[in-house]
UniProtKB/Swiss-Prot annotation:
Name of the gene encoding the protein in the UniProt record: Cttn
Protein name: Src substrate cortactin
Composition-biased stretches (Acidic residues): 17-28
Comp. bias intervals (Basic and acidic residues): 320-359
UniProt modified residues of type Omega-N-methylarginine: R119
Domain remarks: The SH3 motif may mediate binding to the cytoskeleton.
GO biological process: actin cytoskeleton organization; cell migration; cell motility; dendritic spine maintenance; extrinsic apoptotic signaling pathway; focal adhesion assembly; intracellular protein transport; lamellipodium organization
Keyword Nucleus: no
N6-acetyllysine: modified positions: 87, 107, 124, 144, 152, 161, 171, 181, 193, 198, 235, 267, 272, 277, 309
Chain ranges of the SH3 domain: 451-509
Location in or out of the cell: Cytoplasm, Cytoskeleton; Cell projection, Lamellipodium; Cell projection, Ruffle; Cell projection, Dendrite
PROSITE patterns: CORTACTIN, SH3
């Protein structure tokens, strides 16, 4: 042990005068009972044995809260008996004055066929007197023509015989019996009567606000001589009749408004947690009114239909079949023209070879000028250019044929039959027969249909779900079908090549 502690100076200092580590109050009294020691300390929050819950008190509280909630709903909720005029009625004070009720029965006007037209404009074949123009005259009116000036008696005029009509005389005019009185001169007037009698004044002309010479004015007292005990309402008071109605007296005691913390906000906007019905907007809806929310579902639009407008979808679907048929016909015509050009080139080469052979064999002219009848031969091909050289055949009637014509004419029968036969003098227009032409077109279409491979007709409409699929409508034609699987095939429709379900189409025989 002494070796382990060698070289170490261990010093332990004891501080007995310091504070206690537990920091216990000097006046602490441990008054914990035996039960509290067993079930936990009461000084520590949440410790100890918890008391059991009182089920009866809990049930009573729940019942009271439920009753209060139901009473509140009945008071604040809408009442079916009150609305638009009481129980199942109409509020008369809100009803439109010009509106009619369900008990109103309007009287329809009669039809023209039901109206009695004998009553109109005044009874039977007459005129309604209340609608007649006051200035209009009836048929019973007889107008009297005014007499001429030479027929009038002017002894009656302007007042009788040689007089004047009194009712037409001017009121301000005087007659010949009027005698005017001349006013007196100033020197003839008696001025003793004027302004109120003899040396007086006219009482009726005196100014009402004027005072006479007998008036004695009383001088107003000085401010020091006035008794101010009566003023503004009596002794040291205020005149009540002259007091401002909005003014407050000295006896008024102003009541201060309560603070926000002192107000009872349980009453506000219609009582306890309610709404004031008299201030509620008539057009506003309450929380009890449930409005059905519209669905936000949108139908899935296919990829191909997105690029086209909705108004043109139907027209596009109707024109797809027509465009497809026109495209097929254009392809068939192009292939037919190509084949005809190849056949035409081959025939020209064969004709040149026959001409060279005919020139080599031609050494002597024919023995007899009379041509032998030509054998009937079928048309080799529908070549329209062969009709041009054959049009000159009717002019062949001379005894010595021309060398160029004979060689050229001799080459045509050798193309079908390797024998030198002469032409007849009859015009041979039947060389380019029409049935052969149509037969060639049918052969061309048969060849084109054979190039389409396996075809099928769509029974239902199908929208492509991916980029490697195709879409089609009912009765659409699908060509070049490859049966890569039992459930999925590959083909061409509407210019697109891709997969499609096999049970949506029907194969064409």
């Amino acid at each position: 042990m002494w070796k382990a502690s060698a070289g170490h100076a261990v010093s332990i200092t004891q501080d007995d005068g310091g504070a206690d580590d537990w920091e216990t109050d000097p006046d602490f009294v441990n008054d914990v009972s035996e039960k509290e020691q067993r079930w936990g300390a009461k000084t520590v929050q949440g410790s100890g044995h918890q008391e059991h819950i009182n089920i009866h008190k809990l049930r009573e509280n729940v019942f009271q809260e439920h009753q209060t909630l139901k009473e509140k709903e009945l008071e604040t909720g809408p009442k079916a008996s009150h609305g638009y005029g009481g129980k199942f009625g109409v509020e008369q004070d809100r009803m439109d004055k010009s509106a009619v009720g369900h008990e109103y029965q309007s009287k329809l006007s009669k039809h023209c066929s039901q109206v009695d037209s004998v009553r109109g404009f005044g009874g039977k074949f007459g005129v309604q007197m209340d609608r007649v123009d006051q200035s209009a005259v009836g048929f019973e009116y007889q107008g009297k023509t005014e007499k001429h000036a030479s027929q009038k008696d002017y002894s009656s005029g302007f007042g009788g015989k040689y007089g004047v009509q009194a009712d037409r005389v001017d009121k301000s005019a005087v007659g010949f019996d009027y005698q005017g009185k001349t006013e007196k001169h100033e020197s003839q007037k008696d001025y003793s009567k004027g302004f109120g009698g003899k040396y007086g004044i006219d009482k009726d002309k005196v100014d009402k606000s004027a005072v006479g010479f007998e008036y004695q004015g009383k001088t107003e007292k000085h401010e020091s001589q006035k008794d101010y005990v009566k003023g503004f309402g009596g002794k040291f008071g205020v005149q009540t009749d002259r007091q401002d109605k909005c003014a407050l007296g000295w006896d008024h005691q102003e009541k201060l408004q309560l603070h926000e913390s002192q107000k009872d906000y349980a009453k506000g906007f219609g009582g306890k947690y309610g709404v004031q019905k008299d201030r509620m907007d008539k057009n506003a809806s309450t929380f009890e009114e449930v409005v059905q929310v519209p669905s936000a579902y949108q139908k899935t639009v296919p990829i191909e239909a997105v690029t086209s407008k909705t108004s043109n979808i139907r027209a596009n679907f109707e024109n797809l079949a027509k465009e497809r048929e026109q495209e097929d016909r254009r392809k068939a015509e192009a292939e037919r023209a190509q084949r005809m050009a190849q056949e035409r080139q081959e025939q020209e080469e064969a004709r040149r070879k026959l001409e060279e052979q005919a020139r080599a064999k031609k050494q002597t002219p024919p023995a007899s000028p009379s041509p032998q009848p030509a054998e009937d031969r079928p048309p080799s091909s529908p070549i329209y250019e062969d009709a041009a050289p054959l049009k000159a055949e009717p002019s062949y009637g001379s005894s010595e044929p021309e060398p160029e014509y004979s060689t050229e004419a001799a080459g045509l029968p050798e193309a079908s039959n390797q024998q030198g036969l002469a032409y007849t003098s009859e015009p041979v227009y039947e060389t380019t027969e029409v049935p052969g032409h149509y037969q060639a077109e049918d052969d061309t279409y048969d060849g084109y249909e054979s190039d389409l491979g396996i075809t099928a007709i769509a029974l239902y409409d199908y929208q492509a779900a991916g980029d490697d699929e195709i879409s089609f409508d009912p009765d659409d034609v699908i060509t070049n079908i490859e049966m890569i699987d039992d459930g999925w095939w590959r083909g061409v429709c509407k210019g697109r090549y891709g997969l499609f379900p096999a049970n949506y189409v029907e194969l064409r025989q």
